[in-house]
From Swiss-Prot:
Pfam families: Bac_DNA_binding
Keyword Lipid metabolism in record: no
Similarity remark: Belongs to the bacterial histone-like protein family.
Biological process per Gene Ontology, one example term: DNA recombination
Database matches in InterPro entries: Hist_DNA-bd, IHF-like_DNA-bd_dom_sf, IHF_beta
Subunit-level organization: Heterodimer of an alpha and a beta chain.
Role: This protein is one of the two subunits of integration host factor, a specific DNA-binding protein that functions in genetic recombination as well as in transcriptional and translational control.
Gene3D superfamilies linked: IHF-like DNA-binding proteins
Keyword terms of this UniProt record: DNA recombination, DNA-binding, Transcription, Transcription regulation, Translation regulation
HAMAP family (UniProt xref): IHF_beta (MF_00381)
GO cellular component, one term: chromosome
Protein name: Integration host factor subunit beta
Species for this entry: Laribacter hongkongensis (strain HLHK9)
Length: 99
């Protein structure tokens, strides 16, 4: 699901809300999450999951075209861990699809 699809689905589900308000709400939430992660804060949404940063140390990589060694600097990457309720819900729905 893309951001546009999420906005459209929410607008359909809540017809009393103006589509522009739904779009603004989704964009505001995602922007606030991005700002929090960029400042090093952890985000926890109970029942859904948590977002935090994982540290990747510097390493020597390879250029796939030339095969030469390339220095890859250290960095932090966003990481999502699904909460228990979400894991159970996904597991249950995948079991129903298999049947």
């Amino acid at each position: 699901m893309t951001k546009s699809e999420l906005i459209a689905r929410l607008a359909e589900r809540y017809p009393h809300l103006v589509a522009k308000d739904t779009e603004l709400a989704v964009k505001t939430i995602l922007d606030a999450m991005a700002v929090s992660l960029a400042s090093g804060q952890r985000i926890e949404i109970r029942g859904f999951g948590s977002f935090d940063l994982n540290y990747r140390p510097p390493r020597t990589g390879r250029n796939p075209k030339s095969g030469s060694s390339v220095h890859v600097p250290e960095k932090f990457v966003p990481h999502f861990k699904a909460g228990k309720e979400l894991r159970e819900r996904v597991d249950t729905s995948s079991m129903l699809q298999e049947a």
